[in-house]
Amino acid sequence: NSAAASDVYKRQPDNAFVQNEVSNVDATIGKEFMLKSIVALVAACVLILLYVAYRFRRIGGLKAGSTAIVALLHDMLVVFGVFVILRIPLNGNFIAALLTILGYSINDTVVIYDRIRENTGLYGKKMSLPELVNLSINQSFGRSMMTSITTCIALAIVCVVSIIFKLDSIFTFAVPLLFGMVSGVYSTMCIATQLWVSYKTRKAAPAPK
């Protein structure tokens, strides 16, 4: 804290100390931080659910939104895991990284859902649902990968620069974000769409006699 820093300055006046960052951690701040974090994330997820459910009501609506939220929860767990494994403090960078990944991942999901909706009108009666979804993913794969690779390269450069110049605050934001970006591509193609297909297929299956 500031009192401890002042004491060090007085005891060693000949040394040029630089105070880069000050963090206060106590039970009250921890509770307030977690509460605000949970409120922000829940609000973001609810808004995303409503948006996806309304925009893609022709292909499942609420179920499409629910499967997208499951994929987003996966991405948030990945980001949280990176913070825990690297022992990065859960501060403002944590929430910023989570909210950034939410926006990035849902963008990929919306692109593929939009392609599924379009292909449903074109090939809905000519292809099975798994084939239609597979076609939609293949059509969106190139764009998603190019966007992700470009973003990951930029983040990797930021990570290297932050290590060289010892910019801890930037490093603790960029590294979890890098892993979250990769997770977002995976969850969109392998979790959200597959859960949606499973739901639609199970719903369309005849009830056992």
Which functions belong to the PLM regions below?
Residues 55-59, 86-88, 161-166, 200:
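Short helix-capping/hinge motifs at transmembrane helix termini and TM-loop junctions
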Residues 1-9:
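Single conserved hydrophobic/aromatic residue that forms the stacking wall/gate
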Residues 10-45:
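Juxtamembrane "pre-transmembrane" interface segments
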Residues 186, 194-209:
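Interfacial helix-loop-helix hairpins and adjacent transmembrane helices
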Residues 34-74, 78, 82, 149-161:
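Internal alpha-helical transmembrane segments of multipass membrane proteins
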Residues 51-54, 146-196:
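Hydrophobic, glycine/alanine-rich multi-pass transmembrane helices and their short helix-loop junctions
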Residues 62-115, 121, 165, 179, ...:
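Hydrophobic transmembrane alpha-helices and their membrane-interface caps
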Residues 124-145:
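Helix-loop junctions and hydrophobic alpha-helical segments within the transmembrane domains
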